[in-house]
Regions:
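Short beta-strand segments
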Residues: 9, 68-74, 112, 134-141, ...
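Short beta-strand scaffold segments in enzyme catalytic cores
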Residues: 15-19, 120, 142-148
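Short clusters of small/polar residues that mark proteolytic maturation junctions
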Residues: 30-32, 87, 157-159
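Short alpha-helical segments enriched in small residues
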Residues: 115-118
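Beta-strand initiation motifs
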Residues: 25-29, 152, 158
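ATP-binding/phosphotransfer module of carbohydrate and carboxylate kinases, centering on a glycine-rich
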Residues: 1-67, 77-82, 99-107, 124-131, ...
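Structural signature of FAD isoalloxazine-binding scaffolds in flavoprotein oxidoreductases
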Residues: 160-164
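A charged helix-plus-loop insertion that forms the helical arch/lid used to bind
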Residues: 81-93
Length: 337
């Protein structure tokens, strides 16, 4: 029987999994189970077993018919070994997860980080795109991934390539200082473009006289709860929310211009929760505004026919399943020949 390939996206709370056949066609829906990552990798492996068994049952095959597993984690890794904790339990760090899972299942395993997986997923579902693809995904932090023509993600020597949130941008706080990033440095793009940054910026704005009567100035909710409301407020035209997202979009585009200058991708894909927002077209305009301010003219209005514009922007299409789809695609590419 032709082999099938499994993609597993391990998050802090859930595992999203998918199975594809030898032709790369998804079989059945995405299967989701709890990840239990804080309980250690052995507990998560038990959940992976559940997901794989359910996928195989839905596809009408046995686990023996699985030819490879692609796995992504919310942590840096290299050669199958996780070396940064991120949202995982302590015993994940320093462990060769690929070797452990291979020994448990008898199936070859490849692992990368979650943003790389999502980038591969976005590449794999764009069947007409044959060039390189840069994914930039604002979320709690700001992640990214770069897929080369042919579908291979660039991971770097240490698995740290495309930490896009930690390129420097020259934007100052109201006090004239560069904002501090969670990585310990100052001036990182993530310190402006992330949920963590949005909370700080909201708190700073609410201290200003012009927002004294804004309903978010109520003492009845935390800054986290207030920031959670901003997307809905922006969708309904709230001036404060729009101001905050407009600045985020502009700075994101400004930083993307530097990434484009280094990587020269034909397509930039924007991921994260804003891909599902009702004001995403407006946000993309703000991103392009920052990009056009910083980008070389060749990336804005190329003299090369026929496009005339060499850098295209699109929103992510894979949704929550992009990473698992990307890892199934990777497993098929690595182990299917």
């Amino acid at each position: 029987m032709p082999k099938h390939f499994v993609g597993l996206d391990i998050g802090g709370s859930t595992i999203k999994s998918v199975i594809v056949n030898s032709a790369g066609e998804q079989i059945g829906p995405i299967v989701e189970v709890k990840s239990l990552v804080k309980n250690g990798y052995e507990a998560t492996f038990g959940q992976l077993d559940l997901a794989i068994n359910e996928l195989c049952a839905g596809a009408g095959i046995s686990v023996a018919d699985v030819g490879g597993i692609g796995l992504d984690v919310p942590a840096p890794s290299s050669g199958g070994v996780i070396w940064g904790k991120a949202n995982l339990g302590d015993d994940w760090v320093g462990t060769d997860i690929c070797a452990k899972l291979n020994a448990r299942t008898g199936i070859p395993v490849h692992m990368t980080n979650d943003c790389n997986a999502a980038a591969i997923g976005e590449y794999s579902i764009r069947h007409k795109h044959i060039g390189s693809l840069l994914l930039v995904a604002p979320g709690t932090g700001l992640g990214g991934g770069f897929v080369l023509p042919g579908g291979k993600v660039y991971e770097g020597t240490n698995g740290l390539a495309l930490e896009v949130g930690h390129i420097s941008v020259p934007f100052l706080e109201d006090n004239g200082e560069l904002p501090a990033c969670t990585c310990g440095l100052k001036g990182c793009m993530e310190a402006w473009v992330s949920l963590v940054a949005l909370r700080r910026c909201l708190q700073n704005e609410l201290r200003k006289p012009e927002w004294a009567t804004h309903h978010l100035n109520s003492p009845d909710s935390t800054i986290e709860e207030k920031a959670f409301q901003l997307r809905t407020l922006a969708e309904n035209g709230d001036a404060l929310a729009i101001q905050l997202f407009k600045r985020q979009g502009y700075i994101l585009g400004y930083g993307i211009a530097d990434l484009v200058r280094v990587l020269d991708p034909g397509l930039v894909v924007l991921g994260g929760g804003l891909a599902e927002s009702k004001f995403r077209d407006q946000f993309l305009d703000w991103v392009k505004g920052g990009f056009n301010e910083r980008a070389w003219s060749v990336y804005r209005h190329s003299p090369i026919e026929p496009e005339k514009i060499t850098t295209h922007f699109e929103w992510a299409e894979g949704g929550d399943g992009a990473a698992s789809i990307g890892m199934a695609y990777t497993a098929r590419e690595l182990f299917g020949h």
